[in-house]
Amino acid sequence: MGFIGGGPVVEELDAKFWRLTEPLSYQGAVETFTVPAGFRTDFASVPRALVWLIPRYGAYTRAAILHDYLCRTGEVGFADADGIFRRSLHEAGVSVPRRWMMWAAVRLGSRLRGARAVDVLGWLLIAVPSVVFLAVPVVVVTAALLVFWMVELGFWVVGWITRRTAAPPPSPQMKTA
């Protein structure tokens, strides 16, 4: 299962958008999805501030095009489109951390699509304290590890400077008859 054929064949429309010039097919567990030629995409919709972490295209380009297509056409629900996206990222060999970051971002986008301001505020009231709650232990543990590393490095330097090297063994004395 996975994508059928080679990579996507696209033409640039402008600085952000591209158009498929050949169909892109994905064989799922039960269904086959085909993105038609002429479909307009921006590849991975990554905010500009995060492009250094996740570029707009890469090993996940076909998965991003498929996800754009499934969300725009409504062929499957948003949750299913996000699940297919995650599965296709796995099949494309995208690393686990990047795969989960990308999946979490599209899930968040799907959940916030059409959300009322009250819903977004409720989500922020949970998310912001959670980040702060997690940031404090991360900073403390990182600082402790840095102190430990510095102490260990100090002992290593002292040991390296004061080490004693044994005298080289004597050369063998060869006698011939």
Feature map (PLM): residue ranges:
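Extended terminal accessory/targeting regions
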Residues: 1-177
